[in-house]
Amino acid sequence: MAAKYGAKVAIAEEYRVGGTCVIRGCVPKKLMVFASGYAELVDEAQCFGWDIKPGTFDWHAFKTRLNTELDRLEGVYRKLLANSDVDTYDQRATIKDAHTVQLAN
């Protein structure tokens, strides 16, 4: 990273660190697709002799688990940034001029 070569590097993110794919897009979608496959697996398992009773889906429990995984991934990104001498700011920022970034607060 640029910080390792002496550049001043910072990231300002008002919501969560990790980007759209990790926080709002690809990762949540893949976890939802993965979780949705269990109902079909139960049906298939019954065809192979498993005595499994169909259950119900608990959206609250799923969302809790999803958020736990997103928290874990965000922690990985934050640790990588900290270990790379990148300052992080949990707020929105705007570019004021060619040499200045202004934090919202």
Regions picked out by a protein language model, each given a short descriptive name:
Residues M1:
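Glycine-rich cofactor phosphate-binding loops and adjacent beta1-alpha1 units
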Residues K4-A7, I11-N105:
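Glycine-rich flavin
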